[in-house]
Curated annotation (Swiss-Prot):
One of its GO terms (cellular component) is host cell nucleus. Residues 840-849 have a biased composition (Polar residues). Belongs to the herpesviridae EBNA-4 family. It holds the Pfam family EBV-NA3. This is Epstein-Barr nuclear antigen 4. May be involved in transcriptional regulation of both viral and cellular genes by interacting with the host DNA-binding protein RBPJ. It comes from Epstein-Barr virus (strain GD1). One of its GO terms (biological process) is viral process.
């Protein structure tokens, strides 16, 4: 190193003349091979001059590998660096540098080291890398030496060492005696989201003179990252988070970040603000005062010296400073609340635009300024390589990693995004599905209420008093109903095993064929234009002796449908509104008739809108499975409680009853038979699970008391209403709601499975507990197998038990629309006073209640002597009734449509008392089916 300085000094003294005296062997080559020629030790120092090396021309090695072109390129650089006012003159005047730490060396020595590194052609383009960056002394020396050593290792292959995984410690070049050394240092890294630190291992590859002879080099012992203390770690993290928040914040808040960073207090900023910036500053203060701002509070404390941010507008404004157009308290509170609601990352309102700096203009400006500069500088910058080519030979690498590039298998697990054929196929399939949905009108109104499934019995073609129903019928156009006053009724037809029914929605659901499902629904319910209708009565509206007043208008086209057995003197009837395929199913009081469940076929109206609901005679007869589950053994809980006062027939209802015999026993059907009387104007309930091949069983005497003898009252649960025998009173017309048009006779329809999903109509009160008991005919316990239940049903059927006779009164009318969505969901059953109760079906065979076990062996009771359920009474609680005209709910029946071979029953359960008190549910709480039961049903 000393010889290089002396040679340059002599060249400078000679004024750059061509005849200047230089060292004979190496003076013209500059200092390329002289770096590190003398041993450097930590005791002496790296820049100590030796007199012996100054006189001995052989003390420095001679560079043998540089060609003539390299020498020609290096000469002008030497002339440039050493000519004129070269700082080397000042440096060479100092005779010795003894015990000089590299950290304390003058900057001129560092510049000289950079020049020495740049003399090689491989390192020359890196001049800008060192001279254009703001580097401190340690970073400067580190970069100089590491880049020089790396480039030298690239140009010349190092001496191979077995299993050497790092840079080589020795070099084979005679003129490059500097080796390499790696230093490891564990430091802590900053984390932007908190105070936690993560240890990081930093490895620095350093160069050393004479291979591994010396432990220290130009960079050894200089680049040391100090460990940061916990307090400094907290401060640095706080300032880092503040800078990040400023970069992400809206533009109007960046001024306040700068003012706070400058040490200004919030009060000083407040009194110096203008009118237009006050609201923004209040929002900024609100953001500063967020409780979870740990780092921002630390940043604020470090900048201002205050422990936390305060509201500066609460202090008195100085008199000397004018305060024009002051803000009101409301404006201040709103602005502060907006600041409190901002995101913790940065003060930004939701409607603030995100400003992205456009680099195109800045690049154009820089390009124009660069064009005005020296062209040579631009060329040198263009020649700087982006990455240095370095492919060192790694020894000891396992052979398993030596794989050819062509042998690598491509990923075949995911589709290629550039293959548009797959995308087009998916889009075409989606387009077909969308077209199928648009062709079929939406049959399900947007209803939040769950649905109920009722299975319909087969069609009976025997003539009745009104004559047989016409086989050919035409479809009634479906009329969409208003949202809050509709009850959804879904028709769902199942097919027997072995019978291929094209329209079986259950099969389509199992196959998950949405296109075929839409086609079948389109055939069942063709799109028709809507017809204007008068105001309709809300769905599932129970009127009459229930004490319910309905302020809805009656429907102009009532249609009969089915329901569970009605109480003795006051039967019920469901009439869906203008359904395309519905059945007229009525209920009446049980009696000692010989045939159970006669088919209801009312009088044929001349203009029947439901004629097309029946299939043609040529079509194959539909076979209906037995989907319903069995109900409890004894008929005590099955018997509905009669109402306290009778109600006359509805003026618009003139049904006629026809008895249809059934062949199999009721034990095989999984249900206890009810045998209504065929006399009187009341219509009978048609059970929906009766197959088409049923015949009438032989008439057998019933063990029950004759209908003319009133039954003896028995012990009942506490609070149960006293049932009365069915009185024989003349029919009295029932009152209709005010303003309702005179309803017309119900049209003739066919039995069809349907689903009920009620929505609570406004202005109605809920039904009484008798209606709920009629709906919940199977409130028994779970867990018992169905064998006992079937045996009990067979014994009852063998005994020929029949219920007592009820007075023939008109049926109650319940209206509901009809549509086709194949959905099975639990619903809510409304108790007395409009209280909702959840109700669902279960596949678990249930056991009779405690009351039923007490009465076991006594024999069936007449329907008028059935006390209410103890379970229902214990779990019941009263809810205040809604006044007239208030919002209420309608009762609803739920049955689930299950697969073939399964049985159905109705279960009644209740939630715990504390749950009812908390939830505030209705009169009687009924348990809903569990997830396993629901999935089993589906």
């Amino acid at each position: 190193m000393k010889k290089a300085w002396l040679s340059r000094a002599r060249q400078a003294d000679a004024g750059g003349a061509s005849g200047s005296e230089d060292p004979p062997d190496y003076g013209d080559q500059g200092n390329v091979q002289q770096v590190g020629s003398g041993p450097i030790s930590p005791e002496i120092g790296p820049f100590e001059l030796s007199a012996a090396s100054e006189d001995d021309p052989q003390s420095g090695p001679v560079e043998e590998n540089l060609d003539a072109a390299a020498r020609e390129e290096q000469e002008p650089h030497e002339q440039e660096h050493n000519g004129g006012d070269d700082p080397l003159d000042v440096h060479t005047r100092q005779p010795r540098f003894v015990d000089v730490n590299p950290t304390q060396a003058p900057v001129i020595q560092l510049v000289h080291a950079v020049y020495d590194s740049m003399l090689q052609s491989d390192l020359r383009p890196l001049g800008s890398l060192f001279l254009e960056q703001n580097l401190n002394i340690e970073e400067f020396i580190w970069m100089c030496m590491t880049v020089r050593h790396r480039c030298q290792a690239i140009r010349k292959k190092p001496l191979p060492i077995v299993k050497q995984r790092r840079w080589k410690l020795l070099s084979s070049c005679r003129s490059w005696r500097m080796g390499y050394r790696t230093h490891n240092l564990k430091v802590n890294s900053f984390e932007s989201g908190g105070d936690n630190v993560h240890p990081v291992l930093v490895t620095a590859t350093l160069g050393c003179d004479e291979g591994t002879r010396h432990a220290t080099t130009y960079s050894a012992g200089i680049v040391q990252i100090p460990r940061i203390s916990d307090q400094n770690q907290k401060i640095e993290t706080a300032f880092l988070m503040a800078r990040r928040a400023r970069s992400l914040s809206a533009e109007r808040y960046t001024l306040f970040f700068d003012l706070v960073s400058s040490g200004n207090t919030l009060y000083a900023i407040w009194i110096g603000l203008g009118t237009k910036n006050r609201v923004s500053f209040i929002e900024f203060v609100g953001w500063l005062c967020k409780k979870d701002h740990t780092h921002i509070r630390e940043w604020f404390r470090q900048c201002t010296g205050r422990p936390k941010a305060a509201k500066p507008w609460l202090r008195a404004h100085p008199v000397a400073i004018p305060y024009d157009d002051p803000l009101t308290n409301e404006e201040i509170d709103l602005a502060y609340a907006r600041g409190q609601a901002m995101n913790i990352e940065a003060p930004r309102l939701p409607d603030d635009p995100i400003i992205v700096e456009d680099d195109d203009e800045s690049e154009e400006i820089e390009a124009e300024s660069d064009e005005e500069e020296d062209k040579s500088g631009m060329e040198s910058l263009k020649n700087i390589p982006q990455t240095l080519p370095y492919n060192p030979t790694v020894y000891g690498r396992p052979a398993v990693f030596d794989r050819k590039s062509d042998a690598k298998s491509t990923k075949k697990c995911r589709a290629i995004l550039t293959d548009f054929s797959v995308i087009k196929a998916i889009e075409e399939e989606h387009r077909k599905k969308k077209a199928a949905r648009t062709e079929q009108p939406r049959a399900t109104p947007e209803s939040q209420a769950p649905t109920v499934v009722l299975q319909r019995p087969p069609t009976q073609h025997e003539p009745g008093p009104a004559g047989p129903l016409s086989v050919q019928a035409r479809l009634e156009p479906w009329q969409p109903l208003p949202g809050p006053q509709v009850t959804t009724v879904l028709l769902h037809e199942e097919s027997m095993q072995g019978v291929q029914v094209h329209g079986s929605m259950l099969d389509l659901l199992e196959k998950d064929d949405e296109v075929m499902e839409q086609r079948v629904m389109a055939t069942l319910l063709p799109p028709v234009p809507q017809q204007p209708q008068a105001g309709r009565r809300g769905p599932c509206v129970y009127t009459g002796d229930l004490g319910i007043e309905s302020d809805e208008l009656a429907s102009t086209e009532p249609v009969h449908d089915q329901l569970l057995p009605a109480p003795g003197p006051d039967p019920l009837e469901i009439q869906p509104l203008t359904s395309p395929t519905t059945s007229q199913l009525s209920s009446s009081a049980p009696s000692c008739a010989q045939t159970p469940w006669p088919v209801v076929q009312p009088s044929q109206t001349p203009d029947d809108p439901m004629k097309q609901s029946r299939p043609p005679e040529t079509a194959a007869p539909r076979q209906w499975p037995m989907p319903l589950r069995p109900i409890p053994m004894r008929p005590l809980r099955m018997q509905p409680i009669p109402f306290n006062h009778p109600v006359g027939p509805t003026p618009h209802q003139t049904p006629q009853v026809e008895l249809t015999p059934y062949k199999p026993t009721w034990a095989q059907m999984g249900h206890i038979p009810y045998q209504p009387t065929p006399t009187g104007p009341a219509t009978m309930l048609l059970r929906q699970w009766a197959p088409a091949t049923m015949q009438t069983p032989p008439r057998a005497p019933t063990p029950m008391s004759p209908p003319e003898v009133p039954p003896v009252p028995r012990q009942r649960s506490r609070g149960a209403p006293t049932p009365t025998p069915p009185p024989q009173v003349p029919p009295v017309p029932r009152q209709r709601p005010r303003g309702a048009p005179t309803p017309t006779p119900p049209p003739q329809v066919l039995p069809t499975p349907m689903q009920l999903a009620p929505r609570a109509p406004a202005g109605q009160q809920g039904p009484t507990k008798q209606i709920l008991r009629q709906l919940l005919t199977g409130g028994v316990k779970k867990g018992r197998p169905s064998l006992k239940l079937q045996a009990a049903l067979e014994r009852q059927a063998a005994a020929g038990w029949q219920p007592s006779t009820g007075s023939g009164t008109s049926a109650k009318i319940v209206r509901a629309p009809v549509f086709y969505p194949p959905v099975l969901q639990p619903i809510q059953v409304m108790g007395q006073g409009g209280s909702p109760t959840a109700m669902a079906a279960s596949t678990v065979t249930q056991e009779p209640t405690e009351y039923t076990r007490e009465r076991r062996g006594v024999g069936p009771m007449p329907p008028t002597d059935i006390p209410p359920s103890k379970r229902a009474k214990i779990e019941a609680y009263t809810e205040p009734e809604m006044p007239h005209g208030g919002a209420s709910h309608s009762p609803v029946v739920i049955l689930e449509n299950v697969g073939q071979g399964q049985q159905q029953t109705l279960e009644c359960g209740g939630t715990a008392k504390q749950e009812r008190d908390v939830l505030g549910l209705g009169d009687i709480a009924v348990s809903s089916p569990s997830s396993s039961e629901t999935s089993n049903d589906e």
